Amino acid sequence: MELKVLGSSSSGNCYILDNGNEALILEAGVRFLEVKKALGFNLRKVVGCLITHQHNDHAKYIKAMVESGFYTLALPEVWTAKQVGGSRCLEIKPGKGYKFGNFKVLPFSACHDVPCVGYLIEHPDCGRLFFLTDSCMCEYRFIGLNNVLVECNYSDKKLTEAIKDGRTLPSQRDRLMTSHFELSSCKSFLASNDLSQVSNIVLLHLSDNNSDEPFFVSEIERQTGKAVYAARPGLTINIDRM
């Protein structure tokens, strides 16, 4: 199984889990043409698309997903905000699991400034994969994880520097603190979960102004002893369960 990163920032987010025979799309925040290119224009293998919340950098192209015949899972608020409907539009119901091909999917609540979810995804090839972006915390703990995709948007230190330098508005501090994962929060989350079977940790949605990619990656590597990557367009990694 490969993880393909098409976008992981406020400009647009999209990831694909692809084993060659079937593919699951996470988020619809990049142009659909880019999705088709990443799939080698083989749309038949797409078994579904998962959306975390309604913001455009995650859901702008949700209509294209549905119109291409992909079963797409999202909160009711997303369908209302994007004014998209039809038999391929699946509404998340709390505590309910879903199956797309051989992918088992369990949504869980996240903490953002609009209704938002993360996903626990399981497949025979990649094992159990955790996916959380755009959330200031995670109230759940998980066992048996094999791959972790988690937001690490900013650090308090880099945010303070960016505000002082005028690169980030002071008003952004409160919003970030209540809607995105800070470095120390990311580290605390990882420390509180069993990572013994984890092969890869991928850091998502790093802020352009308020993060430090090399430092973030090295900090998480030092803490966990795992292979750590910062998500960026074009990144492809093998996420087969070891």
Where are these regions (language model features)?
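Active-site environment of divalent metal-dependent phosphoester hydrolases
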Residues: Q54-A59, T80-A81, D113-P115, M137-Y140, ...
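Conserved beta-strand hairpin/beta-sheet module of binuclear metal-dependent hydrolase folds
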Residues: M1-L39, V117-D134, N146-N147
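Active-site metal-binding motif and surrounding structural segment of the metallo-beta-lactamase
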Residues: R31-P76
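Short, polar loop motifs at secondary-structure junctions
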Residues: V30-R31, H55, L75-A81, K93-K96, ...
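Metallo-beta-lactamase
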Residues: A74-C126
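Divalent metal-coordination and catalytic microenvironments
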Residues: L17, E27, H53, V105, ...
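Cap/insert and terminal regions of metallo-dependent hydrolase folds
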Residues: I143-G234
